[in-house]
């Protein structure tokens, strides 16, 4: 494998050249004491969980310089049988371990071999946790070095840091999923990592070695030794950023506002791009032209030419991303402008950035420049990073400080070898570090007070590069944050594709919400601190010996006092919110209470107002005193109060949001409060949400945009775009400025998808009868399908009750049924569902859309209850107060679209087939039921008595298996 193919896109040439010589230099370079008497170790186990699995093999090698001078290898006899998949992966059989020593015996022998020397392992936490779970395992070594984390520091631009990838790349022994072979591979990679560390900017090793010396950190001796090889070297992050940015130059782009009309390919040229042998065919040799895709591409082209908007519902299989990419890329290239694509999901953004756009760039003469742009909190803040590395700020005590130092080292190395990039690609686990320690927000950014602003900064550098790119890929969240920030986040982009557009109203409402949160308030006051902690304490220490310190310290003392009062006052507010939450009806875990006329006129609310007004006054006093301190110090020492100024703005925002909600007279908003019933304290919040998102988009965003292409597979209700057009404001800007287009899927839904309506299920309001009948449907369906069933619930209570009833019956039948329990990871549930073809899943909202499991993995989707919003939902209550037919205008079409999204989980390729079971009797008993059925991708459905559903599914399954 060539180094060029092994590094991330955009890696500077000097980094590629350095990586290319590592293997050769590792053969001759010496590192003295740090490679004497070190142990390289690997284990094999019966699985990934230390609670449920056991060791089956341990291998270790003692290194002296470049030589292995001693070895330790043993099988381990587990108490459980080795699973077949582990035997297939490792070739270790139950016969191999039958006469092996027990785990206690093997680990004791390992401890004797190691003798307390440092241990190197790839993903050392895994190996260490298994070894130390055995009696005596803690005696093996006190020093464990994770070569996975070290490789991210030494080689930050590698596309992968898997041991097998690096071993192959640098010509080391191959990985074979056997402990002894993997140890040999790591012995070779270890020396490569040491050489790579010496290639990082001079002085960086010393900076890392000296970082927070009071924190025990296994990498410190390595960095300290390497720093000693270049004594006196001074590290400059600013200089390192300047070096890496030397070759990062781009042409300026034109603001499309300056162009009277766009130069675009003709319709015939667009059609040729999608014809056999055309542009798209060159990108994908197996591509076959689709009439629906060509029609969409032409519609997008016409919208760009005329400067108008389009709403395009493109069914599954149309290939909508390639339909808009080609005309949008041509618009950017021919007019020297930047165009934008906003997606909801990371999956689609990654598909565009790492697959479709690179392939398109390869086939276009002159190429195509593109970049991804994310929110501020995805990028390292270099000012914070610099202060952290110099020990000028405290490490968050709630996390392992060693993990924080490792994260600082990884980020430092990355920004020294990367012109741009974000935290998401660095393998830093969110649960291991406090991300706000390394990131900033738009309202917190120091901008001109920051030594890295603008060009050396990753946030503003990304924005600058976006302004020079042909295509910018971002997400709905950032797009709407940019609208709220009046365009200060994104470059001026006048032509947009809003993909996955069915969810943008909800996302805009979320992004524009004004929230007063107990958890965020607690974090804010922790950051402010007081006499001994936080930003106020830091300012006191920084100013203690300054000229004028008496004045400054007096202002600091006043600010500390008012902040303490404000902290107590806002805590009283959240106590009151929790009491008000007792009035909420419904909600299993969370109470969501509308702050409507009835509540505002109650005695409870009037009692609550006393603490609310007191908090507003205390917050305003704290805001004034902190701002006075910031203004006084900023005149002479602005760098001292940068962080405090950031926090002060948050304090002001908290006061303003609380005033807005308590006052409640701004009719643009609906007001509500939230309480987590499972917690005795914490989790309380108050929220003001925009009611009419369409009005806001029509006045604040669409006038700034020449062309917006709204695309999704789920937009119409009974073939009508009326609901969507109202939701995004297109019905407020004139009929001539936009048009809609429906494109049928290229898949044969009528043949491959069956829809079953259970016609005799009791009304859900008769809960026990309903659950009993639904239990029978679920059991029969799972048994008939043999697994591969996804059941989508609207509330946790029903899901957990039915899981308790159904799961034991599935277990007795040898079928696996999982449930989206509290705090469970949706990603892990998804991966488990996909990896086990016969498993089934009970799930909530996270799985109603965006969950793809093609083929035999998913053959049946069951929707027990139509997903109407709760009658007590604050937005629904506010709409009902203002409009007579609000339920039919909003709640009904929103539920129809959610069912369409859920149905879309079934058919993800032309060969997929499956059954959708709708078990809500209202589809039959209510007139609105037809809206759901006529909106589905197949026009045919069958009404079947619930007792016959299992038999029907058996026949359906047999018929489709014969077809294959």
What feature does the model see in each segment?
Residues 2-30, 191-267:
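Acidic two-metal-ion nuclease catalytic site recognized across multiple nuclease folds
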Residues 350, 442-443, 447-471, 475-614, ...:
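Signature of the SF2 helicase/ATPase Hel1-core->accessory helical subdomain module
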Residues 2-143, 156-177:
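Conserved non-catalytic scaffold segment of RNase H-like nuclease domains
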Residues 436-470, 480, 485-487, 615-759, ...:
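A contiguous, basic/glycine-rich beta-loop/short-helix subdomain that forms a polymer-engagement track
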Residues 746, 758-769, 821-924:
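Conserved RecA-like P-loop NTPase helicase motor core
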Residues 250-251, 256-257, 270-278, 336-338, ...:
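A substrate-engagement module of RecA-like helicase motors
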Residues 115-135, 156-229:
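Acidic, Mg2+-coordinating catalytic module of metal-dependent nucleases/exonucleases
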Residues 264-312:
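Conserved pre-motif I regulatory segment
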């Amino acid at each position: 494998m060539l180094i060029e193919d092994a590094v991330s896109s955009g890696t500077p040439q000097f980094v590629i050249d350095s990586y290319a010589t590592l293997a050769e230099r590792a053969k001759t370079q010496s590192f003295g004491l740090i490679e004497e008497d070190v142990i390289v170790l690997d284990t094999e186990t019966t699985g990934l969980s230390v609670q449920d699995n056991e060791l089956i093999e341990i291998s270790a090698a003692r290194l002296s310089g470049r030589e292995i001078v001693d070895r330790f290898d043993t099988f381990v006899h587990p108490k459980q049988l080795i699973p077949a998949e582990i035997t297939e992966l490792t070739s270790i059989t139950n016969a191999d371990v039958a006469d092996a020593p027990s785990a206690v015996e093997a680990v004791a022998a390992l401890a004797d071999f190691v003798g307390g020397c440092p241990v190197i392992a790839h993903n050392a936490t895994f190996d260490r946790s298994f070894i130390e779970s055995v009696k005596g395992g803690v005696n093996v070594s006190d020093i464990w070095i994770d070569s996975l984390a070290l490789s991210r520091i030494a080689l930050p631009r590698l596309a992968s840091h898997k041991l097998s990838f690096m071993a192959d790349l640098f010509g080391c022994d191959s990985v074979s999923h056997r402990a002894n072979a993997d140890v040999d591979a790591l012995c070779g990679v270890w020396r490569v990592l040491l050489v790579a560390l010496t290639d990082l900017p001079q002085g960086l090793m010393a900076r890392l070695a000296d970082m927070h010396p009071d924190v025990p950190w296994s990498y410190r001796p390595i960095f300290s030794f390497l720093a000693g090889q270049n004594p006196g070297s001074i590290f400059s992050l600013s200089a390192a950023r300047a070096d890496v940015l030397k070759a990062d130059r781009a042409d300026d782009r034109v603001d499309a506002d300056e162009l009277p009309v766009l130069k675009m390919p003709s319709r015939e040229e667009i059609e040729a791009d999608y014809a056999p042998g055309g542009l798209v065919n060159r990108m994908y040799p197996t591509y076959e032209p689709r009439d629906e895709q060509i029609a969409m591409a032409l519609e997008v082209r016409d919208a760009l030419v005329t400067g108008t908007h389009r709403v395009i519902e493109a069914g599954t299989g149309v290939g909508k991303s390639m339909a808009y990419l080609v005309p949008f890329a041509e618009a950017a290239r021919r007019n020297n402008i930047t165009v934008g694509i906003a997606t909801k999901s990371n999956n689609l953004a990654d598909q565009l950035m790492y697959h479709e756009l690179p392939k398109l760039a390869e086939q276009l003469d002159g190429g195509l420049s593109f970049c991804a742009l994310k929110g501020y909190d995805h990028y390292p803040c270099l000012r914070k990073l610099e202060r952290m590395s110099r020990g000028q700020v405290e490490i968050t005590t709630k996390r392992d400080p060693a993990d924080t130092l490792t994260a600082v080292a990884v980020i430092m190395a990355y920004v020294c070898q990367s012109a741009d990039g974000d935290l998401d690609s660095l393998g830093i686990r969110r649960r291991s570090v406090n991300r706000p320690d390394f990131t900033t927000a738009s309202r917190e950014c120091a901008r001109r007070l920051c030594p890295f602003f603008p060009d050396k900064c990753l946030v503003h550098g990304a924005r600058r590069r976006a302004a020079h790119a042909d295509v910018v890929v971002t997400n709905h969240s950032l797009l709407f944050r940019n609208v709220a920030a009046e365009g200060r986040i994104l470059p001026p982009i006048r032509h947009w594709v809003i993909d996955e557009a069915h969810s943008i109203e909800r996302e805009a409402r979320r992004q524009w919400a004004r929230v007063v949160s107990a958890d965020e308030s607690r974090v804010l006051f922790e950051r402010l601190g007081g006499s001994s902690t936080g930003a106020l304490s830091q300012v006191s220490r920084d100013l203690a010996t300054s000229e004028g310190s008496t004045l400054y310290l007096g202002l600091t003392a006043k600010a500390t006092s008012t902040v303490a009062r404000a902290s107590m006052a806002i805590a009283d507010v959240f106590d009151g919110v929790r009491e008000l939450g007792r009035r909420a009806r419904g909600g299993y875990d969370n109470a969501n209470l509308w702050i409507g006329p009835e509540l505002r006129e109650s005695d409870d609310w009037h009692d609550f107002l006393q603490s609310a007004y007191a908090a507003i006054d205390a917050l305003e006093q704290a805001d004034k005193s902190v701002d006075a301190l910031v203004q006084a110090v900023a005149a002479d020492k602005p760098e001292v109060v940068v962080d405090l100024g950031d926090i002060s703005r948050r304090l002001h925002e908290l006061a303003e949001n609380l005033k807005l909600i308590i006052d409640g007279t701004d009719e643009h908003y609906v007001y509500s409060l939230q309480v987590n019933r499972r917690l005795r304290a914490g989790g309380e919040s108050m929220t003001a949400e925009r009611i009419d998102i369409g009005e806001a988009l029509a006045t604040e965003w669409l006038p700034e945009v020449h062309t917006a292409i709204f695309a999704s597979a789920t937009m119409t209700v009974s073939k009508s775009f009326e609901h969507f057009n109202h939701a995004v404001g297109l019905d407020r800007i004139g009929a001539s400025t936009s048009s809609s287009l429906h494109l049928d899927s290229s898949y044969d839904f009528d043949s491959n998808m069956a829809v079953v309506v259970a016609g005799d299920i009791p009304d859900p309001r008769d809960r026990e009868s309903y659950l009993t009948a639904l239990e029978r449907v679920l059991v029969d369906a799972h048994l008939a399908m043999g697994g591969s069933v996804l059941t989508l619930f609207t509330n946790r209570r029903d899901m957990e009750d039915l899981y308790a009833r159904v799961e034991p019956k599935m277990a007795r039948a040898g079928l696996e049924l999982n449930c989206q329990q509290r705090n469970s990871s949706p990603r892990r549930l998804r991966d488990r569902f996909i990896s086990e073809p016969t498993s089934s899943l009970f799930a909530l909202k996270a799985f109603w859309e965006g969950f793809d499991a093609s083929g035999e993995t998913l053959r049946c989707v069951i929707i027990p209850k139509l997903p109407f919003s709760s009658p007590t939902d604050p937005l629904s209550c506010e709409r009902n107060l203002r409009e007579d037919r609000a339920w039919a205008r909003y709640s009904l079409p929103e539920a129809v679209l959610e069912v369409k999204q859920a149905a879309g989980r079934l058919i993800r390729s032309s060969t997929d087939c499956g059954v959708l079971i709708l078990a809500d009797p209202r589809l039959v008993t209510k007139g609105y039921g037809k809206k759901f059925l006529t909106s589905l991708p197949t026009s045919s459905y069958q009404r079947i008595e619930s007792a016959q559903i299992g038999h029907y599914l058996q026949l359906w399954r047999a018929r489709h298996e014969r077809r294959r």
